[in-house]
Amino acid sequence: GSSRMFYPQGEVVAAREAGKAGTGYTLSTLSGCRLEDVKQATDCPAWYQLYLLGGRDVALKTIERAKSAGFSAIVLTIDTPVSGLRELDVRNGTKELLSQNPLTMLPFLPQMLAKPCWLSQWFGDGGLMNFPNVVLENGPMGYTEIGPALEQSVVTWDDLKWIREAWGGKLIIKGVHIGDDARKAVDLGVDAVVVSNHGARQLDSVAPTIRVLPEIVKAVNGEIDVLMDGGIRRGSDVVKALSLIHI
């Protein structure tokens, strides 16, 4: 999510390049670009990563938009119950910069002016992005609203039923971290699970995904696909993950 924070039309560009590379792309609800624009930019398989931000009614409208746009799967995210306390962001002044308060942003002005090319691109792309795929009563959700919105959007097993009914297609759960949850996902008709700890960016003491991968694979017993993210930096990491599931 939020690729647009780092590059103009970031999600559109990423999806387009994924298509050129012949691989798939998963678009986060927390994208700075409209899901329709992102899907239109690529011919690659595209999945929509769903957060329940804004509540059930907002999510249902987003699901309908994703269906109409041609996304082929919903990836329901369960590994982000709160916004993580990221120490680097505390030190680098992210909160102050996102506040859009001129007084708190003033100390960072020299750094901004030292990057005129970036600054012009940032303003040219509309400045601080919002979330056009989370449309609330007063318009798209603002960037500073993420924390409170996440705290009110915790996913439960009961949510799977209405999400599946509304979507009608492939449903994947991202953030499964123990075998019991993986087994329950299978029993409830989920098509795949993603073993993920959100890069340990939400809870830094959680177990690495490669350590819990064998437990998840054993629990699903080959009945659904198992994907894994986090910690893969080179080809040897892929070999290790594949080896662990065959022990």
Mark where each language-model region is.
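Hydrophobic, well-ordered secondary-structure elements that form the walls
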Residues: V193, A241
